[in-house]
């Protein structure tokens, strides 16, 4: 969430910056609520002071042998009025907090201003798409022909947007995840983590999925008097980032760089009819996530580094890609700046997103109270959090299958994966 003080004191500026991402802040409503908050705050403090002053006079009256009943009645009346004002103030603060939790992050000044994805800005390309002397097939046809992708049984077992992988395709999928983890832990300095696939509501509030995007989640257990509800993770960003929720980290521990390979689960609400064929948009998919927790002054450089780490996976696999910086109107709810990495898919003759790398600055940290403390500082400060896919395993599999296809329907195994696949040079 945004800094409440900044929101209160710079309401018009905040509204202008949020408007660049298509979010309309109700300035009039917030202004009225803030005026009411100030009024209630003053009234509460004045009532508290009056009650305290009159309460002190009770002892003095008793010492003089005076009747204290009228004073006691006055204190009681003030107490009732004070309790009513406190309840009204608490309700108002809850309303303000609810509004604050629904307001997206402010775009960084370096993010290009634009309305939608058509105004994203390409910053670089790597590799040259291969030219084929035969008609290219998509990953669905190639995978089904070698018996590795089984959509029919996935529909029978569960429903649409699920997959059963078998044989050499399943092995390649596993090899990709292992390759990514090894690269990030041995060359990029990340610590591997094994995390829960079910998270509570506090965790989802911390990273920004709740309260606004509950319909995108698979909820497995509703909240009860005994505890919070549980939901399947939409990304390992949630458990990894929440490791520092309600925590004060020593400055010497920073930066903290974490990675995890997990299944991810998304309802894909609002995606009806999009990417219905193949592995591009699934309810369950594997992803290797990258998370960095850094000091504020280092977060923009950390974003460049994290994005480069994700790009390195594609470079080592020999997959052409381009990197774009998202315009303000296309950024995610909690992001201040985002790079999307898009891999080349020959069958679609276009680039498709395979990684999204974002700097959340202190937006998540404020929601989570994730802080760090320098030895020279009296008070702890909010961390900056970053995350990105390094990479989405299923989409990387799609890219490998399509870019490395041969005329006979076989698939060449990229050199980087051969050590993970028993030395196989081809599958199919």
UniProtKB/Swiss-Prot annotation:
One Pfam family, short name: Seryl_tRNA_N
Signal peptide start and end residues: none
Superkingdom assignment: Bacteria
GO BP: selenocysteine biosynthetic process; seryl-tRNA aminoacylation
Entry-linked InterPro entries: aa-tRNA-synt_IIb, aa-tRNA-synth_II, aa-tRNA-synth_II/BPL/LPL, Ser-tRNA-ligase_type_1, Ser-tRNA-synth_1_N, SerRS_1_N_sf, SerRS_core, tRNA-bd_arm
Keywords: Aminoacyl-tRNA synthetase, ATP-binding, Cytoplasm, Ligase, Nucleotide-binding, Protein biosynthesis
Associated pathway: Aminoacyl-tRNA biosynthesis; selenocysteinyl-tRNA(Sec) biosynthesis; L-seryl-tRNA(Sec) from L-serine and tRNA(Sec): step 1/1
Entries under CDD domains matching the protein: SerRS_core
One GO cellular component, as annotated: cytoplasm
GO function terms (MF aspect): ATP binding; serine-tRNA ligase activity
Gene3D superfamilies listed in its UniProt record: Bira Bifunctional Protein, Domain 2, Serine-tRNA synthetase, tRNA binding domain
PROSITE patterns attached to this UniProt entry: AA_TRNA_LIGASE_II
Catalytic activity: tRNA(Ser) + L-serine + ATP = L-seryl-tRNA(Ser) + AMP + diphosphate + H(+); tRNA(Sec) + L-serine + ATP = L-seryl-tRNA(Sec) + AMP + diphosphate + H(+)
Binding site residues for ATP: 266-268, 353-356
Protein task: Catalyzes the attachment of serine to tRNA(Ser). Is also able to aminoacylate tRNA(Sec) with serine, to form the misacylated tRNA L-seryl-tRNA(Sec), which will be further converted into selenocysteinyl-tRNA(Sec).
Record remark on domains: Consists of two distinct domains, a catalytic core and a N-terminal extension that is involved in tRNA binding.
NCBIfam families: serS
Subunit organization: Homodimer. The tRNA molecule binds across the dimer.
Protein name: Serine--tRNA ligase
Organism ancestry: Bacteria, Pseudomonadati, Pseudomonadota, Gammaproteobacteria, Alteromonadales
């Amino acid at each position: 969430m945004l800094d409440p003080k900044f929101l209160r004191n710079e309401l018009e500026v905040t509204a202008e910056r949020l408007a660049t991402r298509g979010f309309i802040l109700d300035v009039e409503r917030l202004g009225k609520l803030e005026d009411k908050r100030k009024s209630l705050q003053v009234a509460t403090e004045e009532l508290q002071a009056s009650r305290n002053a009159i309460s002190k006079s009770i002892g003095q009256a008793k010492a003089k042998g005076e009747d204290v009943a009228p004073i006691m009645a006055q204190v009681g009346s003030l107490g009732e009025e004070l309790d009513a004002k406190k309840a009204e103030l608490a309700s108002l603060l809850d309303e303000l907090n609810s509004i604050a939790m629904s307001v997206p992050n402010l775009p960084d000044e370096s993010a290009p201003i634009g309305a939608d994805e058509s105004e994203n800005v390409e910053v670089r390309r790597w590799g040259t798409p291969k030219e084929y002397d035969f008609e290219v097939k998509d990953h669905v046809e190639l995978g089904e022909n070698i018996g590795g992708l089984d959509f029919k049984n996935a529909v029978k077992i569960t429903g649409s947007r699920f997959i059963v992988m078998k044989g050499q395709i399943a092995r390649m999928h596993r090899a990709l995840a292992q390759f990514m983890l090894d690269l990030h832990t041995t060359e990029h300095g990340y610590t591997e983590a094994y995390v829960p696939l079910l998270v509570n509501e506090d965790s989802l509030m911390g990273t920004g999925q709740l309260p606004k995007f509950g319909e995108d989640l698979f909820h497995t257990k509703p909240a009860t008097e005994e505890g919070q509800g549980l939901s399947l993770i939409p990304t390992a960003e949630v458990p990894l980032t929440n490791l520092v929720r309600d925590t004060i980290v020593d400055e010497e521990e920073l930066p903290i760089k974490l990675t995890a390979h997990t299944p991810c689960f998304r309802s894909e609400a609002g995606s009806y009819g999009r990417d219905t064929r193949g592995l591009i948009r699934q309810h369950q998919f594997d992803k290797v996530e990258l998370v960095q927790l850094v000091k504020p002054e280092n977060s923009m450089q950390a974003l460049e580094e994290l994005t480069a780490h994700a790009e390195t996976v594609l470079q080592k696999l020999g997959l052409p890609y381009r990197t774009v910086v998202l315009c303000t109107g296309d950024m995610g709810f909690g992001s201040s700046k985002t790079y999307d990495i898009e891999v080349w898919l020959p069958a679609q003759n276009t680039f498709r997103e395979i990684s999204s790398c974002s700097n959340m600055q202190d937006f998540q940290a404020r929601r989570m109270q994730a802080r760090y403390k320098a030895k020279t500082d009296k008070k702890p400060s909010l961390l900056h959090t970053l995350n990105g896919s390094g990479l989405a395993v299923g989409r990387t599999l799609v890219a490998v299958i399509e870019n490395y296809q041969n005329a006979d329907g076989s698939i060449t195994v990229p050199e980087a994966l051969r050590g993970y696949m028993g030395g196989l040079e081809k599958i199919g």
